[in-house]
Amino acid sequence: LISDRSEGFDMGCGSGRWARWMAEKVCTLNCIDPSDAIEISKNNLKNFKNINYFRASVDDDILLTASQDFGYSLGVLHHIPDTQAALSSCVKLLKPGAPFLVYLYYSFDNRSKLYSLIWKASDLIRKLIFNLPPFLKYWITDCIAIFIYYPLTRIVLAAERCGIDISNIPLSYYKDHSLYTMRTDARDRFGTPLEQRFSKVKIHNMMLEAGLDEIKFSSNAPFWCAVGYKK
């Protein structure tokens, strides 16, 4: 479905974290982001000649309807007030039969109540942090990554090597990830004004409503990642 002749889009590309991987595999990648991060993406991906950059939001109609061979939006649409409308805007850009990959924050529908309570406590912290001036917000989220995410993941990794089940420990997903990823995700998690969460069933229904079918969910963290194909 995706080849070196394909053209697609990265909706909410940020600093180009996923675009770096995808651009190597396709003919043209359209990176779209409404924030200053699009400039960071340009710098990070300057060696790629097959990327177009657009400072725009999901509903700005930057690309032609039904023009794209694939699309993805990873960890972005749950920060938009009307996530359903944003998802539908992405899908309308796809050609019939084209795949769309999405990652939306889960509502802990596959976790314990204690896990959910820990998140609620962290969400109170997020509501304090996102109102801070940008430089202070970035400094705090970097500190969270360096002094909370990273040490905890080292402990989790050691526990796993000792044969302990770590699947229900918060942040265990990051045990094999770089500090750069932790910094990026901490900023995404704590530095945004709106964070919505959805159950697997809800996401499935949203994707159907947006015009996708043959929907499949990943059984691995992070949750929920799903792919569907435009009808």
Residue ranges with predicted function:
Residues 9, 15-60:
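Class I SAM-dependent methyltransferase SAM/SAH-binding core
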Residues 69-81:
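A short SAM/SAH-binding and catalytic strip from SAM-dependent methyltransferases
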Residues 173-231:
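C-terminal lobe and adjacent flexible extensions of AdoMet/dcAdoMet transferase-like proteins
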Residues 122-199:
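C-terminal alpha-helical "lid/dimerization" subdomain adjacent to the S-adenosyl-L-methionine
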Residues 99-131, 141:
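Conserved class I S-adenosyl-L-methionine
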Residues 2-7:
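Short helix-loop-beta connector
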Residues 84-96:
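A short glycine-rich, Lys/Arg-flanked "PGG" loop and its adjoining helix->strand segment in the class I
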Residues 60-71:
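A short acidic, Gly/Pro-enriched loop at the edge of an enzyme's catalytic core
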